[in-house]
A protein has these predicted regions:
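Charge-rich, low-complexity N-terminal segments
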Residues: 2-148
Length: 148
């Protein structure tokens, strides 16, 4: 019996965390300085649960382990314990200087705000999802009370 016969779309959410520092190039407030966050990322996907009785994924939209692998490979492994800087001529010299001492400096082609990081993360995750599964939403916390 398929209990999902009338429930066509289900959403799944998994939470991830990583530590990273960034600086907002040219910003007119305190966040222009290098500072860090304990990021919490909530990834929600949607799809229809597999219905085939012989299907090993019967009743699942997606294996949580697969979602974990995708997000860890695309996001967490790159950004955890990193310094994220916008790719600019000024930051290129800063990056070169810092790279002599520190290893995980990530340069991006956007201002590394919470909002822009979400756009980047959405592209990275979406292209890896299995057929029939879509990215529904992302929520990225920079602090316990601030998120996009």
């Amino acid at each position: 019996m398929n209990i999902f016969a009338h429930m066509t779309v289900i959403r799944l959410t998994k939470e991830f965390s990583f530590e990273a520092a960034h600086a907002l190039d040219g910003y007119d407030g305190p966040c222009r300085e290098i500072h860090g966050h304990s990021y919490r990322l909530f990834v929600t996907v949607k799809g229809c649960p597999a219905a085939g009785e012989g299907d090993p994924k019967c009743g699942m939209v997606m294996d949580f382990g697969v979602l974990k692998r995708i997000v860890n490979e695309e996001i967490v492994s790159h950004f955890d314990h990193s310094l994220v800087l916008r790719q600019t001529p000024c930051n290129a010299s800063l990056r070169a200087m810092l790279a002599e001492r520190f290893g995980n400096i990530v340069t991006v082609d956007y201002q590394p705000t919470c909002e822009n990081m979400l756009g980047d993360f959405a592209r990275r995750i979406s292209r890896r999802l299995p057929e029939g599964v879509e990215l529904y939403s992302l929520r990225l916390h920079e602090t316990a009370t601030s998120f996009a």
